[in-house]
Amino acid sequence: MEGLVPGRIVYFVFDAGRAAEAQRRRTSSQSILARMKATTPAVEGGAPAIVAWPAGAQAHIGNEVKAGDIYPAMVLRVWGESGCSNLKVMLDGSDEYWATSINFDAAKAQGSWHWMFDGQQKRYDPTAVKV
């Protein structure tokens, strides 16, 4: 596919399954605070108290991802001439989503990628040499 090379930025359209997958890893600051306060008491002469969320643990926090949402994504790998690609989707939060084997669809169907604007694929020629 013309102009499709690793490093290009395109748009990815979430479908319900991928949105749920991205959302499953996310939490909120309120949820973290509640879990940090929740502990399982220590057993006398046995196991120590267990904190539901250890201080310093990494969390993925951000706005909700839903089916139909469109996010910018960087092309990581291109699989042949059809436009099927692996993408790193930049979410609205502290994390990103790795979308694999995503097909191009000019109609912008859910679960596909498309160019950000008409003609984008022709605006950059990585083979052009400037002296």
Residue ranges of model-derived segments:
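Short beta-strand-centered aromatic/proline hotspots
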Residues: 21-34, 55-57, 63-79
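Intrinsically disordered, low-complexity regions
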Residues: 29-33, 47, 99, 126-128
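Intrinsically disordered, low-complexity, charged/polar segments
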Residues: 61-71, 76-131
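Long intrinsically disordered, low-complexity regions that are acidic and Ser/Thr-rich
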Residues: 31-55
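Low-complexity, intrinsically disordered short peptide segments enriched in small/polar/basic residues
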Residues: 6, 10, 47-48, 58, ...
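Short, charged beta-turn/beta-strand-edge "cap" motif at the junction between a beta-strand
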Residues: 1-3, 8-9, 13-20
